[in-house]
């Protein structure tokens, strides 16, 4: 099965392939990491990679589908890109600002933890403009993120790195946040599905978000 055949599959199709043993979570995770590192030179969409934990979690997922451990969870083995404004234990969270370039979190946001508890695998963090306050994705800290379909254009913002990750097949699902279009603009610009859930459906994080306008 070629790289093109499965890196663009939906999470549902990947899970079905894992269950039927047509695909291995470990194989897919390795390919996602490889793809992301190739794409980085072209689009500059990623800020941090989690190779070790991703491969460890992928092996756990693989054993689950082989019936060696626990029952597969809802998102077992599904690769997850995390927007850089969200906290993941032992990872950097600058929100695109030099002010917080050295901040490393000792906790994981509830929104992300729920995805991890469902079996998803964190593989990297994605770029965002400074404090997520632009409809494009660039910052003095991380530079300019470009659209994978045309490098002269933006992928939108502020979840532009996540949009690129999905559009390039570097992950199956990606986190984002949306006040004035920060999920919807990258989805439109990159040609992927983006959903802004109703207020209250997800925990309100990060804590600086703007009350009823904030949806993760």
Functional labels for PLM-detected ranges:
Residues 2-179:
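Gly/Ser-rich catalytic/binding loops embedded in alpha/beta enzyme cores
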